[in-house]
Amino acid sequence: NITKNLKFGENLMVTHSVQDMMDTQGSNGVISSALVFDPSIPVYTEDGGYSGSGELGTDMRNPVSIIDRTDKKRTRDRIFGNVYAEWEIIKGLTAKTDFGYDWSQWQEKEYTPVIPEAGRPNSVAELTQQDWQSTRWINTTTLKYDGKWGRHKLMALGGWSFENYSMNFTNMRGSNFASDDESQRFMDCAGTINWILTGRKEWALMSAFTRFDYSYADRYLFSVNFRADGSSKFSKNNRWGYFPSVSGAWRI
């Protein structure tokens, strides 16, 4: 009965995350601004606006205004899972194949409103948006033998794997928004599209591998490994790399 020695398994993970972000690094971040901003200048003006540095060209912003005005979010969706099948052909000899899939889509948006106060003014509202989508799949198939005869033990493993990764991305910036209202903070509402950058990255990897482990009385150990990797990242004239290794040990 072949089904008696068959095993199947799977796992699946689906996630959705939204991260509110804040620029804390660099000379224009909220931490640097809090350290260098003149403490004698009030946070707000008499009419309820934000106080500036009081001096044009200082490239300095009110740290409270940075916190209140920052609208930077990162949204990510991910589907990750794998399925496998394992078959014990005869006692000690097992075949296994595993297929994994990982899909991700994420977006990062940062909206900068009009900043009128002196220090680091911004005369027009801007929206910077980055979108990525990636797909990765991998398949690994192995044949493994475990045997024992008296004080002798042997493990032999052979297999191959295939892996592929691709990512598409679009980066863009828009400006001249009619309103700072949150309902208008989308690229379709921009009066001007300043730039758009699109691209694609892709690579593939194919591998074959084998391993032999031998031990006598669990004291004398010997191992031989060999692996061959063919990658699209390697040069066209040298797509394959070969990696042999031999090791031995004696347990005292």
Please give the residue ranges for each predicted region.
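Glycine-rich, phosphate-binding/catalytic loops in enzymes
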Residues: V114-I115, W240-Y242
